[in-house]
Amino acid sequence: MQFKSVNPYNGEELASYSSLTETELLGKIEESEKAYSDWKETSLQKRCTLIQKVASILTENAHEYAEMITLEMGKPISESLAEVKKCAWVCEYYAENAQAFLSDTIIKTDASKSFVTHSPIGTVLAIMPWNFPFWQVFRFAAPTLLAGNTALLKHASNVFGSAEMIEDIFIKAGVPAGVFQNLIVHHDTTETILAHNSVQAVSLTGSERAGSAVAALAGKHIKKSLLELGGSNAFIVWEDADIDAAVNTALVARMLNCGQSCIAAKRFILLDGIYDEFVTKFTEGLQTMKSGDPLEKDTQVGPLARVDLADELQKQVKESIQKGAKLLLGGGQKDAYHEPTILGDVTPGMPAFDEETFGPLAAMI
């Protein structure tokens, strides 16, 4: 199977990737198991030194990695650069604090001596999303590897270029072969990977549907699972709020990463006394945000990561309007680009109220 990486801003193909064969996949899983035998015995000090080196490589090559993020999923370059720097920070943070985090903790029981100790469990599968293609991986990988585990990455298929770069960073840092590996595979192979005796756990960040499917597989094969799923967060504004401050916060909370975040503010619940003022100022603020080529440093709003994602958002907008929502701003779509959109008078029963909206849509309630 071939996977294509496509620039969502202009539709140009960036690269093509061939899926691993079943034999190649099993070989990588077995390599991870072999690497675990040595990695778990590697001193914590050595592991910390290597993760610190990962942080240095991220910092030194931040612009190169940020450009790949922007090309593959359309994030404005300024945000991509911030993402890479945050990845360096998380590596430094865990490397500096690993000793404290992994130290034994004495606890009181009826026994003469009781304590909690931390031991690695083996190979961990990471199923990661496209919206923060570097951050989601490094916030998993740094603590996982420092704890003595090995990792297999199954990234979203539209950001395989980022995934390849991430694996290369660990190689350049001197992390032993097999400790961190990227798998170019279809999501249909998830059960094959999870069912393998070498894989002890899975960490997934993604949709509720994906999480439900992976949790079921983990349960079937009695593997540990850690899930971070979607959200439809409410942003509540009271009548005594500083409206200007609330609007400034709301613009960032809704529009960061073009609204493609599980923790983004999506539904704005406004008390009657400040509804008009907030909506007016929020609309004015949104109109000042610059849309355009995400590689340009002053661009604030780029395309969504894929055309089908923009199509889905457009469907949610139209259905909400059909059910009585008022279009206050935007509403248009061209390919992967969706205009920043504000809907007013949003009520239960509308997609803008009931569903997670993964894009630049603000629902005023």
Regions found by a protein language model. Name each.
Residues 209-347:
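ALDH superfamily catalytic-core signature
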Residues 11, 47, 69, 91, ...:
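Residue-level signal for inorganic ion chemistry
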Residues 103-245:
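Rossmann-like NAD(P) dinucleotide-binding subdomain of oxidoreductase/dehydrogenase enzymes
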Residues 15-19, 35-41, 126, 235-238, ...:
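Short, well-ordered beta-strand elements within core beta-sheets of diverse protein domains
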Residues 33-36, 40, 55-62, 66, ...:
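Structural signal for hydrophobic packing residues in well-ordered secondary-structure cores
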Residues 143, 192-193, 249, 319, ...:
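Well-formed, non-transmembrane alpha-helical positions, independent of function
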Residues 1-112:
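N-terminal Rossmann-like NAD(P)+-binding subdomain of aldehyde/semialdehyde dehydrogenases
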Residues 9-12, 49, 177, 196, ...:
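Short glycine-enriched loop/turn motifs at secondary-structure junctions
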